[in-house]
Amino acid sequence: MTLDLDAHKKDDKLLITTIQQEYKILAEYKMIESEKLSGIYVIPSYANSLQWFGVFFGRQGLYAESVFRFTILLPDRFPDDKSLPTIIFQQDVIHPHVCPYTHSLDVSHAFPEWRCGEDHLWQLLKYLQVIFSDPLDSIRGIEVDKLKNREAAELLMNNKEEYVARVQENIKESKEHIFDTPPTEDPHYIVFEKFQQDVHGPVLERIKAGRSKQTEPSAQQGNGGHATGLSWVKEGEFKPLSIE
């Protein structure tokens, strides 16, 4: 009987710990939403909240027009564990901070360890955004042999023309796979559809109309003078059309 009670207590403790962790992860997601990071979309997996799906859209600099899919893997005891979350790209990405073999992004230069309550996932994504916006600046003050891709770093510093050419190859490849069949059946995997006038046309017009109304004085006053982004998601699926 005593053994049964101890087992139940352990099960209850594990359940409570799991629920608390889920709330913390949900809070991280809410913070990302509130930060409105331009060009980055992420969502936790439906099956496993420790795995997130993401897409990075390059908006400026050498990586403009890139579309890089990535996965975020959170440590089992996130966010209490000091271990860092892992970001892994789904394709080759040439960058001094991206390992050419595992496609993983080295975030240790910005986050030596994870500090619960101080470090957040939105900051991790902001770091991703910044290092792709200006890769050269992202390696200033760091010894070349401490970078994940030494060859990329040396090209960036000494042969920028060749570096740009390789980046363009990455960008071309990324665009060729935008509409690929999802590698998973997880309903939260981010899916993109080719534009279809009969399906997406009406939604696009609603987005345009909404943006037009937000520029009117009355609309801005009703929202405290702040414009908000608009998005529509196909019912039952995660296929967004949005405007920031």
UniProtKB/Swiss-Prot annotation:
InterPro entries hit by this protein: Ub_conjugating_enzyme, UBQ-conjugat_E2_core, UBQ-conjugating_enzyme/RWD
Top-level taxon of the source organism: Eukaryota
One Pfam family recorded for the sequence: UQ_con
Similarity field: Belongs to the ubiquitin-conjugating enzyme family. FTS subfamily.
Gene: cbx
Descriptive protein name: Protein crossbronx
Residues in coiled coil: none
Gene Ontology biological process terms in this record: defense response to bacterium; sperm individualization
Domain spans labelled UBC core: 20-176
Organism: Drosophila simulans (Fruit fly)
Region of interest: Disordered: 209-244
